[in-house]
From Swiss-Prot:
Belongs to the RNA polymerase beta chain family. The RNAP catalytic core consists of 2 alpha, 1 beta, 1 beta' and 1 omega subunit. When a sigma factor is associated with the core the holoenzyme is formed, which can initiate transcription. The lineage of its organism: Bacteria, Pseudomonadati, Pseudomonadota, Betaproteobacteria, Neisseriales. The gene is rpoB. Pfam families: RNA_pol_Rpb2_1, RNA_pol_Rpb2_2, RNA_pol_Rpb2_3, RNA_pol_Rpb2_45, RNA_pol_Rpb2_6, RNA_pol_Rpb2_7. Coiled coil: none annotated. This is DNA-directed RNA polymerase subunit beta. DNA-dependent RNA polymerase catalyzes the transcription of DNA into RNA using the four ribonucleoside triphosphates as substrates.
Length: 1392
């Protein structure tokens, strides 16, 4: 087995019972692939598919003028290079975007020509605004902040059939409805009312009988009835009435007369129910007609107009009910044959027939006018307007788009559905198979007449009791709109606005000799894009607390947003877990608040298909044998198969074992024989999301607690020294690498140079491109602020001389340790009560943990100050500030900006700024002072940037931005100079490395070769030696050597050109950088200068901080106890944390107990390894012990492939504790945990005996740190990976003495952000009332709150030393009086 360079250093012992068939896919693929498909930068202009930008342009262009003689055609588009790179955009607060230019062709036709003739073609490039670019990690930089476009899970376009579940009508009758949802355009609804009449409505407007729509589509009454009904023919004669015998219609009917065979024998007696046997007898008897009573004709509806063949008189119209009078009329006129609609109460209802009777519109035009009046009430219906509106509703590509998905969904639900035998022979089968044959193939992206009729027919058939309604929560009916598609829609809407403006101007294009760029104004496009990325509900400020929160945010799918649900209207069904979520959407990870179930996370292996439906992978099973073939199935496809679980037992050949296997079929769990199984899950963790799959022993946790665990891992603050979890799940490495927090090698090579800021790798010859210099330079991110103010800092994980392969770890980032996600610290935990300090989930923690900086984190705050141009003059950033103490000034440089490295506290000046003050009337004293001391100090006020209250830290960076045309101060200039110097050093280093690498390659290439001549009198035919090369004055002279081998000579020339090119590139890059830095900055209007100060704040763990494990076991630190008072073990080691044992049973998150036991084993194994290393045991003994660890149970590791040195390095990395992986749903069993505990703490070891273990080695004797006595019973002790969450008491607690007031109520503001005070609310008043503390209450409600006069008076009294209270009227009472007056009630106060 091949281990990577990093994996060798610390192999994670996995307890997985099954081989991993499919690697965890790239976790950000959804975002990155979607946007790449939108931009199509990789494809040549002519190879671009009709997706993304290309599709948007194609849908709007060509734009034709109103007169038809000019048109604009789209040729292709190009994206330029972004002006600034990502870090520069973040610093300057601008958007990381590239200019979009489209090649547009203006075609002008000849007006005089008889047929369309091109008169003139003008073509040029048109600037279409800027398109934000995605960063390599799947986010966007918008106005300097990283944002994520969350994917949306919305209802798929298509046709959906449902019923109201009996909720609308009191009788509980099911009212069926259908809805045709397009991607863009009007919604068309069909619905039954309680009287079984069928209505339609457009865009949820007023409902109308559905026959109006059918008439508007061109059908008359007879045609409508012909579509929706089977017919019955009755033959009238003097002997009675007969009808054609249709056997299928007789079943379940009662015989109205005796049914006789040809011999006169009774087959079914009158009044008897006709059974299936009777039908067989009737068919065998060869009867073709049946006698019926004349009364049975009454109430039936005629299928067609009855016309007297002689006179042409219409005796009765289609859909007329047959009455006694009508029968008499038929008799008089000698009608021998009538055709009626076949209707029965059971499965052929009279819905359309009855609806037609309520519809009074005469024909096609009248129906269209009725629809126009409903859509545009109050507007006069002219013939042209009526036609235009009706066509634009569903039949125009400009205003209606069903989309490819919608058409596919529509066809599969209507034309391509499987029909039963009875349906095949009915009107419905004839309609789909004969009348509308081929309609599915020709269906475009607009609706056709056939589509509307087929939808109505399917709804009627549903009401008749045939077929199933759709489940709208099924993932086959919900699709994912990712970032590319969302951006495309915005871009298209912007282009549509451009189109309207262009059409107006196109008529003048020829006369005014305009070019395409004169016609097109790109502002609407860039405004639409800007609005979407800046303020859309789906464009969210990226959660960047730690790498997991980044990855999870990018994998989120939301049902909210434009075109989606709203949290107020979403019911339980939408939020609930659905069987189709299996392997697609995580059933665990979702927010706890009002958004529960509306915001979900993609499962680990889920992906979207071309239509936007979620798919999950399965292994194919053939005849009970599981193959290596993997198919991705969508929720619709999955319903057709029987699927076994990933943990089904297999033999060595991959055959399913056992008589019955647990499977899923159509969302139900069943037991099936192995030969029925068609697919099998690829992995046990396929069901859950990334965050949930990071929880070890998830299978032993209650779902509610697992949900909290998954959510709280995203809030874990990166610690100063990240520590890998001893008990993990094996997916930690994927998260660290895919989040781009940890850096991996792009190409294999040898590490040439390492320092804290960069790593240089000389690429292997076989991976370097021929003739190119192979060097990769990785610049590390140092102390950068994340969106949540946490610290992003990368640390090199390699040494000079290390040999790396592609994909090996180069540097660790925040919250990663040796390329694995490390969100918290491994803590030794005891479950026991301790003096009530762990009551209600409180956490008792050792002082040693805080002193060792285990949970110390660095937070970086950014503070800004701007100098504006005011009416009274420009604000000035300066050191010369009135009334500023010497101590404060010492921290500022001559420009008035704080030094880097200064330690600052609340109230300290960071940037000195003065603002001109309005001239005021001076008192004589002030005039005197001005005359003596000059006038500078008095006409400006101090508006400096000061350190906010409750904050202290170290200044780590300062950035100064100056508007174009304003002279830079010394500090700004020195920042630019140092930046340029650093950049030049970087470039020089790169060039030096390139040079060294190139000349090393040349040396290997030419030493030993024959030369034709060269410098220092190298003769023809002589061999080139290392000594000769070393003796040349400069290495660049090597290029003058003439080689006999022509191929080598060419390669030498290529390297020379490559080096020259690199040098030129470096100079060019330096000039670009210089230009960027020296040009003025784009600042907001009126702003002359902006200074950003970055402050690093060190937050140590303290009482009040929130902490949690990975199983939803959260709590608040109640006390940090001196280490000598903590409970300790027999060997003197104190525990780190004491948790409450009562927090476990009721919460049912037993996973934490198993984690603690396995962590205890990991720690014990680490201690044994540490002892062996200290005793300098041989590598063979270490290898033997590691073999017991890795190859006892679970997944086997190939330790034989490691050298002795690698074994020793592996062992030294396990000193603090072994690394275990317990994959989700395939984790360590109890027996395996016991095995590890026995390996860690062998019974024969005297050290182990001293600890006082119980039989299972899960509990030990602990001693009270204060008294030294042993506790009464043994205590569960172990190691748990514990996290510090981003709810720090420092950020929550604040105190106010005086501060801002609300102007209206005169009461203090609330909240830390407003520096508010505490509210003495209604319930607090009740408490004082209950105690009868009248004076305290009066004081609270008046002088201490909003009694303005009373407050002033109180201050005066205190100053004078008179301790008495003069309470007045609270301002809030005045507000109440005003409120009552505003309602028109006069209220006055009368004084007594």
């Amino acid at each position: 087995m091949n281990y990577s360079f990093t994996e060798k250093k610390r192999i994670r012992k996995s307890f997985a019972k099954r081989e991993n068939v499919l690697e965890v896919p790239f976790l950000l693929a959804t975002q990155i692939d979607s946007y790449a498909k939108f931009l199509q930068l990789e494809n040549a202009f002519d190879k671009r598919t009709d997706d993304g930008l290309q599709a948007a342009f194609n849908s709007i262009f060509p734009i034709v003028s109103h007169n038809g003689y000019a048109r604009l055609e789209f040729v292709y588009y190009t994206l330029g290079e972004p002006l600034f790179d990502i870090p520069e955009c973040q610093l300057r607060g601008i958007t990381y975007a590239a200019p979009l230019r489209a090649r547009i062709r203006l075609v002008i036709l000849d007006k005089e020509a008889s047929k369309p003739t091109v008169k003139e073609v003008r073509e040029n490039e048109v600037y279409m605004g800027e398109i934000p670019l995605m960063t390599p990690s799947g986010s966007f930089v918008i106005n300097g902040t990283e944002r994520v476009i969350v994917s949306q899970l919305h209802r798929s376009p298509g046709v959906f059939f449902e019923h109201d579940k009996g909720k609308t009508h009191s009788s509980g009758k099911l009212l069926f409805s259908a809805r045709i949802i397009p991607y863009r355009g009007s919604w068309l609804d069909f619905e039954f009312d309680p009287k079984d009449l069928l209505y339609f409505r457009i865009d949820r407007r007023r409902k109308m009988p559905v026959t109006i729509l059918l008439k508007a589509l061109g059908y008359n009454n007879e045609q409508i009835l012909d579509i929706f009904y089977d017919k019955e023919t009755f033959y009238l004669s003097s002997n009675g009435v007969q009808t054609d015998l249709v056997a299928g219609r007789l079943k379940g009917e009662t015989a109205k007369v005796d049914i006789l065979d040809k011999e006169g024998n009774v087959l079914v007696a009158k009044g008897k129910r006709i059974t299936a046997k009777n039908i067989r007898d009737i068919t065998n008897a060869g009867l073709t007609r049946l006698d019926v009573e004349q009364e049975s004709l009454l109430g039936k509806a005629l299928a067609a107009d009855l016309i007297d063949s002689e006179t042409g008189e219409v005796l009765a119209s289609a859909n007329d009910e047959i009455t006694e009078e009508l029968l008499a009329k038929f008799d008089i006129n000698g009608v021998k044959e009538i055709t009626t609609l076949y209707i029965n109460e059971l499965d052929q209802g009279a819905y359309i027939s009855n609806t037609l009777r309520t519809d009074e519109t005469a024909g096609r035009q009248a129906a269209r006018v009725a629809i126009y009046r409903m859509m545009r009430p109050g507007e006069p219906p002219t013939e042209e307007a009526v036609e235009q509106l009706f066509n634009r509703l569903f039949f125009s590509e400009d205003s209606y788009d069903l989309s490819r998905v919608g058409r596919m969904k529509f066809n599969t639900r209507t034309y391509e559905q499987k029909l039963s035998e009875a349906q095949q022979n009915s009107w419905y089968g004839r309609l789909l198979n004969e009348t509308f044959a081929g309609a599915a193939d020709k269906g475009g992206y607009v609706l056709s007449v056939e589509d509307i009729v087929a939808s109505i027919a399917t709804l009627v058939e549903l009401r008749n009791g045939h077929g199933e309604v759709d489940d709208i929560d099924h993932l086959g009916n919900r699709r994912v709109r990712s970032v590319g598609e969302l951006t495309e829609n915005q871009f298209r809407s912007g282009l549509a606005r451009v189109e309207r403006a262009v059409k107006e101007r196109l008529n003048q294009a020829e006369s005014e000799n305009l070019m395409p760029h004169d016609l097109i104004n790109a502002k609407p496009v860039s405004a639409a894009i800007k609005e979407f990325f800046g303020s859309s509900q789906l464009s969210q400020f990226m959660d960047q607390t730690n790498p997991l929160s980044e990855v999870t945010h990018k994998r989120r799918v939301s049902a909210l947003g434009p075109g989606g649900l709203t949290r107020e209207r979403a019911g339980f069904e939408v939020r609930d877990v659905h069987p189709t979520h299996y392997g697609r959407v995580c059933p665990i990870e979702t927010p706890e608040g009002p958004n529960i179930g509306l915001i979900n996370s993609l499962s680990v292996y889920a992906r979207t298909n071309d239509y936007g439906f979620l798919e999950t992978p399965y292994r194919r099973v053939i005849d009970g044998k599981v193959t290596e073939e993997i198919d991705y199935l969508s929720a619709i496809e999955e319903g057709r198969y029987v699927i076994a679980q990933a943990n089904a037992d297999l033999d060595s050949d991959g055959n399913l074992i056992g008589d019955l296997v647990t499977c899923r079929e159509k969302g139900e769990t069943i037991m099936a024989t192995p030969d029925r199984v068609q697919y099998m899950d690829v992995a046990t963790g396929q069901v859950v999301s990334v965050a949930a799959s990071l929880i070890p022993f998830l299978e032993h946790d209650d779902a509610n607690r697992a949900l909290m665990g998954a959510n709280m891992q995203r809030q874990a603050v990166p610690c100063l020294r990240p520590e890998k979890p001893m008990v993990g799940t094996g997916i930690e490495r994927s998260v660290a690498v895919d989040s781009a927090t940890a850096i991996v090698a792009r190409r294999g090579g040898v590490v040439e140079y390492v320092d804290a800021n960069r790593v240089v790798i000389r690429v292997h010859d076989d991976e370097a491109t021929a003739g190119e210099v192979g060097v990769d330079i990785y610049n590390l991110v140092k102390f950068t602020r994340s969106n949540q103010s946490t610290n992003i800092n990368q640390r090199p994980a390699v040494k000079a001389g290390d040999v790396l392969q592609r994909g090996d770890l180069v540097a660790d980032g925040a919250s990663t340790d040796l390329g694995e996600l490390a969100l918290g610290q491994n803590m030794t935990i005891a479950f026991m009560p301790w003096n009530g300090y762990n009551y209600e989930d409180s956490i008792l923690i050792s002082e040693k943990v805080a002193a060792d900086d285990r949970y110390t984190s660095i937070h970086i705050e950014e503070l800004n100050v701007v100098a504006r141009d005011t009416k009274l003059g420009a604000e000035d950033i300066t050191r010369d500030i009135p009334n500023l103490s010497e101590r404060m000034q010492n921290r500022l440089d001559e420009s008035g900006i704080v030094y880097i490295g200064a330690e600052v506290e609340a109230g300290d000046v960071l940037v000195g700024k003065v603002t001109p003050k309005g001239e005021t009337q001076l008192t004589p004293e002030e005039k005197l002072l001005r005359a003596i001391f000059g006038e500078k100090a008095s006409d400006v006020k101090d508006t400096s940037l000061r350190m906010p209250t409750g904050m202290s830290g170290t200044v780590i960076d300062v950035q100064v931005f100056t508007r174009e045309g304003i002279q830079r101060d010394k500090r700004a200039q020195s920042i630019i100079d140092s930046e340029l110097k650093r950049y030049r050093l970087d470039l020089n280093d790169q060039l030096r490395i390139f040079d060294n690498d190139a000349f090393d390659r040349i040396e290997r290439m030419i030493v030993g070769q024959k030369a034709n001549g060269g410098p220092m009198k190298l003769t023809k035919g002589s061999e080139i030696t290392t000594e000769y090369l070393a003796g040349l004055p400069s290495r660049h002279d090597w290029f003058d050597i003439r080689l006999t081998d022509e191929d080598l000579a060419k390669q030498l020339e290529l390297i020379k050109l490559s080096l020259q090119q690199k040098r030129e590139e470096a100079d060019e890059l330096y000039e670009i950088k210089k230009k960027k830095l020296t040009q003025g900055d784009e600042l907001q209007p009126g702003v002359q200068k902006m200074v950003k100060v970055f402050i690093a704040i060190k937050r140590r763990l303290q009482a009040g901080d929130k902490m949690a494990g990975r199983h939803g076991n959260k709590g608040v630190v109640s006390r940090i106890l001196p280490v000598e008072d903590m409970p300790y073990m027999a060997d003197g080691r104190p525990v780190d944390i004491v948790l409450n044992p009562l927090g476990v049973p009721s919460r049912m998150n037993i996973g934490q107990i198993l984690e603690v036991h396995l962590g205890w084993a990991a720690k014990g194994i680490g201690e044994r390894i540490d002892r062996m290393l200290k005793e300098r045991r041989k590598a063979g003994e270490l290898r033997e012990f590691l073999n017991k660890l890795y190859n006892g149970s679970g997944k086997k590791e190939d330790l034989d492939s490691l050298t002795d040195e690698e074994i020793i390095e592996l062992a030294s990395n396990l000193r603090k504790g072994a690394s275990f992986a317990s994959p989700v749903f395939d984790g360590a069993k109890e027996s395996e945990i016991r095995e590890m505990l026995n390996l860690a703490y062998p019974s024969e070891d005297p050290e182990v005996e001293k600890l006082g273990f119980n039989d299972s080695k899960t509990q030990i004797t602990l001693y009270d740190g204060r008294s030294g006595e042993a506790f009464d019973r043994k205590v569960t002790v172990g190691v748990m990976h514990y996290l510090k969450l981003h709810h720090l008491v420092d950020e929550k607690m604040h105190a106010r003495s005086t501060g801002p007031y609300s102007l209206v109520t005169q009461q203090p503001l609330g909240g830390k952000a407003q520096f508010g005070g505490q509210r003495f609310g209604e319930m607090e008043v009740w408490a004082l009332e209950a105690y009868g503390a009248a004076y305290t209450l009066q004081e609270m409600l008046t002088v201490k709150s909003d009694d303005v006069n009373g407050r002033t008076k109180m201050y005066e009294n205190i100053v004078k030393g008179e301790h008495k209270i003069d309470a007045g009227m609270p301002e809030s009472f005045n507000v109440l009086v005003k409120e009552i007056r505003s309602l028109g009630l006069d209220i006055d106060l009368e004084r007594y």
